[in-house]
Design a protein with these regions (language model features):
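Short gly/ser/thr-rich secondary-structure transition/capping motifs
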Residues: 19, 104-111, 174-178, 268
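An acidic- and aromatic-residue-enriched active-site/binding cleft used to recognize and process polar
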Residues: 32, 114, 157-159, 198-200, ...
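A transmembrane-helix-recognition feature enriched in membrane-embedded lipid enzymes
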Residues: 82, 89-108, 147-151, 165-169, ...
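Helix-to-loop junction immediately C-terminal to a conserved catalytic motif
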Residues: 99-129
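Intrinsically disordered, low-complexity regulatory regions of eukaryotic proteins
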Residues: 1-54
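Non-catalytic C-terminal accessory region of glycerolipid acyltransferases
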Residues: 47-91, 185-334
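Catalytic core of membrane glycerolipid acyltransferases/transacylases, capturing the structured
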Residues: 119-183, 188-189, 200-216
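A residue-level signal for beta-strand positions that form part of recognition/binding surfaces
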Residues: 14, 108, 122, 151, ...
Length: 334
């Protein structure tokens, strides 16, 4: 009779899964490849793909600490405001975070060509304008801050700055009056400046004229860029035209309330307050290659024909970029 084979009871403990069970105890399953059992391997894989998810408790704690510090600064007055009213602390901790759900989840904004924006130093961003309300300007401002850390100082119409609450918040978020003096002042201190030459003609145009650029005025933004010797970055925003499609403009009511237009959309005023909810269109913002003005010299700002031609060049770049991206997108909402 052959000798029986003796199986040792302890020939080395098999490796156990590195995960924990739902009640916080160590998992007793045998570990497979990667140190996790078959049950917990998918969860570990998800954490590897999204490392911030594993740090979520720490992220929440960090956010709470930042908000407490913010509250202390507001109560003690220990926060800077520049001489044009820009409150960086309020903007970064309150105003921009309020816009992020719209940017990330509602309009799902994609940005192209952010690398064309200089990391520092003065730059003039020139964009199309649309959407009934100037939300496109806010999305551009937020997108650039989140990807570059730069604050874009927007030039706003006097009407926007005169509105109660809105005007005050506009000033605190770094915006200023659309005039040459303020624009040059900001550029000469190294700021990124955003301008929308179409003005109310662009943001309040009917839906049938969507993505057709209106006049760019007399080229005031080009004169500013030439006098400051800064690059111009053309910006094309696709998606804002669909958030409040204007089907009619009640001019008598606009005159009565002192507004540039009184829009009628498919949902406003038909649905009352619900008509103020923008439609969830899919957005794309593209930043074109900079147009360098330094070599032209400041005296070029006094040449009306040169200013007109450069204005037309910037406008044409934006218009062609809009057409290109409209052709490429599958649907206004996806």
């Amino acid at each position: 009779m052959a000798d029986a084979r003796v199986i040792p009871l302890h020939q080395g403990e098999a490796a156990r899964c590195a995960a924990q069970t739902a009640d916080g105890r160590p998992c007793r399953n045998r570990a497979g490849a990667g140190g996790y059992c078959a049950r917990h391997a998918p969860e570990a894989s998800a954490r590897d793909r999204h490392p911030t998810a594993a740090l979520e408790p720490n992220a929440i704690q960090k956010w709470l600490e930042e908000m407490l510090a913010f509250a202390r600064r507001r109560m003690t007055g220990d926060y800077p405001i520049d001489d044009m009213g820009f409150d960086r602390d309020l903007t970064e901790h309150v105003l921009l975070p309020m816009l992020r759900p719209l940017y990330r989840s509602w309009w799902r904004v994609d940005q192209i060509g952010v690398e064309n924006i200089p990391a520092d130093g003065p730059v003039l961003l020139v964009s199309n304008h649309s959407g009934t309300l100037p939300l496109d300007a806010l999305m551009m401002k937020l997108g650039i801050f989140d990807q570059t850390g730069r604050h874009v100082r927007l030039l706003a119409a006097d009407l926007a700055l005169a509105l109660p609450v809105v005007g005050e918040l506009a000033r605190k978020s770094g915006n200023t009056l659309a005039c040459e003096e303020d624009a040059l002042r900001l550029l000469r201190t190294g700021e990124a400046l955003g301008v929308f030459p179409e003005g109310f003609k662009g943001v309040g145009k009917p839906f049938r004229e969507r993505y057709r650029l209106q006049r760019f005025g007399r080229g005031g933004f080009v004169e500013v860029a030439l006098r400051a010797g800064v690059p111009i970055v053309p910006v094309a925003i696709v998606g804002a035209e669909e958030i409040f499609p204007i089907v009619a403009n009640l001019k008598p009511l606009a005159r009565l309330f002192g507004l540039p237009y009184f829009p009628i959309t498919p949902t406003f005023p038909l649905l009352g307050p619900l008509g103020a909810i923008p439609l969830p269109s899919k957005w794309m913002i593209e930043y074109g290659e900079p147009i360098h003005t330094e070599s032209f010299g400041t005296e070029a700002a006094n040449d009306p024909m040169f200013v007109f031609n450069l204005t037309d060049q910037v406008r044409e770049v934006i218009q062609q970029t809009l057409f290109k991206n409209l052709i490429q997108r599958k649907n206004a909402f996806f």
